[in-house]
Amino acid sequence: MQLFHLCLIISCTCPTVQASKLCLGWLWGMDIDPYKEFGATVELLSFLPSDFFPSVRDLLDTASALYREALESPEHCSPHHTALRETILCWGELMTLATWVGNNLEDPASRDLVVNYVNTNMGLKIRQLLWFHISCLTFGRETVLEYLVSFGVWIRTPPAYRPPNAPILSTLPETTVVRRRDRGRSPRRRTPSPRRRRSQSPRRRRSQSRESQC
């Protein structure tokens, strides 16, 4: 795989520093953490099993359906949009290079080795990155980080002492919103106070009842 890595370094044309670090460093196995600037780590993502992440094609379709306009815009929308855009570009470069290497290798065993390596190792890293940034844009970064921590605690807890089902990302925003709402709830009450209820004298209430009877 050293030849494949060398070709990746030479052919990668991603324009930003982040994409260059992703293609030339992180995918190559160097000690670079592309999640650090977003408050997460590679180790935190590693708690999620490989079959947890959808396929690259499904993730690309999801990103296009939800954020196509922002991804195609030359303007900077958010760090997650930029990271997602450059990850997609890097995956395209990787596929182009893998196709070229596969077509120029005469040995079928070597071609299969390249394809399996890309799909198993680099493909998983791309799936993790795509899922992370799409989820942060959809649910919010804090919610995703809370989910990763919750899942990490759940998966490391012995089965006898943990709930049978793993945490679900889509349910966290509801509990998070409720918890924050409870913290910041004002002391105002919608129901009338006892003082207001006692402000009406019995005579006033009797006059109202007589008027209602008329």
Curated annotation (Swiss-Prot):
Residues 186-214 form a propeptide. Residues 178-207 have a biased composition (Basic residues). Residues 186-208 are annotated as: 3 X 8 AA repeats of S-P-R-R-R-R-S-Q. One of its GO terms (cellular component) is host cell cytoplasm. Coiled coil: none annotated. InterPro entries: Hepatitis_B_virus_capsid_N (IPR013195), Hepatitis_core (IPR002006), Viral_capsid_core_dom_sf_HBV (IPR036459). Residues 165-214 are annotated as: Disordered. SUPFAM superfamilies: Hepatitis B viral capsid (hbcag). Gene3D superfamilies: Viral capsid, core domain supefamily, Hepatitis B virus. One of its GO terms (molecular function) is DNA binding. Belongs to the orthohepadnavirus precore antigen family. This is External core antigen. It comes from Hepatitis B virus genotype A1 subtype adw2 (isolate South Africa/84/2001). The lineage of its organism: Viruses, Riboviria, Pararnavirae, Artverviricota, Revtraviricetes. The gene is C.
